[in-house]
Amino acid sequence: MVQVGAHTSIAGGVDNAVEEQLEYDGTCGQIFTHSPQVWQDPNIGDEEATAFRDRSAEAGVGPWVIHSSYLVNLCTPKDDLREKSIDSMQKEVDAAATLHIPYVNVHLGAHTGAGVEQGLDNAASALEELDIPDGVTVLIESDAGSGTKLGSTFEELAGVLDRCDQPLDVCLDTAHMFAAGYDLSTPEGVAETFEAFDETVGLDHLEYIHLNDSKHDCGTNKDEHAHIGEGKIGEAGMRAFINHEAVADVPFVLETPTENGKSYPWNIKRVRELYEEA
């Protein structure tokens, strides 16, 4: 059975994320440990952490992934932002270890004029400064590629992995890949994309999927998510992606919108329908 869940809230306690996931009929999931729009430390007490670990195990929900702050910029040439980003990431990987969450997901960020190679060097060296606990892996998320943001090409993802001797793998976001020019709207396009990823990065580095349809055309670098099968990737592309052998054992987490009377439960059900139809 396909592993699929959604991004859930920790409001009222991190263990509430498990209950929310169960309401959605999800079997894995993603959380923020704090508001992603501000520099803030995770504030998760021992009792909360124990309750989260126990409830996840009891309900069979996992693997979970922590999504890092949107303010983190590993590629930045600015020393103060770099130090804040490293500090934030250290606290996220420590929180992951406490919660027994195996993954922390991060966007590489933007080089803001320093250039692609320098940006990749900056990201890799920032990641090298982390003391990543055993059992935790940092996932570099593929990006839509607007402005000077890095991580939109498989070559850039591989560039960071090759430069860094840390437990690093990749989270592919379907909407971001599509925006970056990887055409996932047809079975042929999906197959070609996975072949290119395997040749450049390696499928052994693919640990998680952000499964989202896109409201914008392929190659526009515009990141706006749509309901599964109802965006520009469409039903045929989503079906081909969900059922491709490359992701047979890779969990999917949704970041789809709540609109038009549809939210996470509808999208999770839709993923399972597309999986079963193949």
Curated annotation (Swiss-Prot):
InterPro entries xrefs: AP_endonuc_2, AP_endonuc_F2_Zn_BS, Xyl_isomerase-like_sf, Xyl_isomerase-like_TIM-brl
EC number: 3.1.21.2
Protein origin, superkingdom: Archaea
Keywords of the record: DNA damage, DNA repair, Endonuclease, Hydrolase, Metal-binding, Nuclease, Zinc
Binding site for Zn(2+) 3: 176, 223, 225
Gene3D superfamilies: Divalent-metal-dependent TIM barrel enzymes (3.20.20.150)
Family to which the UniProt record says this protein belongs: Belongs to the AP endonuclease 2 family.
NCBIfam families: nfo
Protein's job: Endonuclease IV plays a role in DNA repair. It cleaves phosphodiester bonds at apurinic or apyrimidinic (AP) sites, generating a 3'-hydroxyl group and a 5'-terminal sugar phosphate.
Record protein name field: Probable endonuclease 4
Gene, per the UniProt record: nfo
